[in-house]
Curated annotation (Swiss-Prot):
SUPFAM superfamilies: lambda repressor-like DNA-binding domains. It comes from the Bacteria. One of its GO terms (molecular function) is DNA-binding transcription factor activity. It comes from Serratia marcescens. Residues 30-49 bind DNA. GO terms for cellular component: cytosol. The keyword DNA-binding applies. This is Control protein C.SmaI. May control expression of its associated restriction-modification system SmaI.
């Protein structure tokens, strides 16, 4: 089962990096992203610090607020492909 734990930690790290990167690309503060998404600012911060286990519905909300897709939030290549 250790492999599953490592994979899970990788996904949390990728999500954290991508949420922060897409937020910056969209010139949004955590407060602005919170307002757009309906999530609390501290929740956004905890996602970016890899402290949250995000639900599928929250992933969808974040993807819409960041003008991207759930798969792009969960892959290292998602952001690179969009930047060209």
């Amino acid at each position: 089962m250790p492999d599953a734990d490592i994979c899970f930690m990788d996904i949390k790290e990728i999500l954290a990096e991508n949420v922060r990167s897409y937020r910056n690309i969209n010139n949004l503060s955590q407060e602005q992203l919170a307002e757009i998404s309906g999530l609390h600012r501290t929740y956004i911060g905890s996602v970016e610090r890899k402290e949250r286990n995000v639900t599928l519905s929250t992933l969808i909300i974040l993807a819409k607020a960041l003008n991207t897709s759930v798969p792009k939030l969960l892959t290292r290549q998602g952001l690179k492909n969009e930047q060209g």
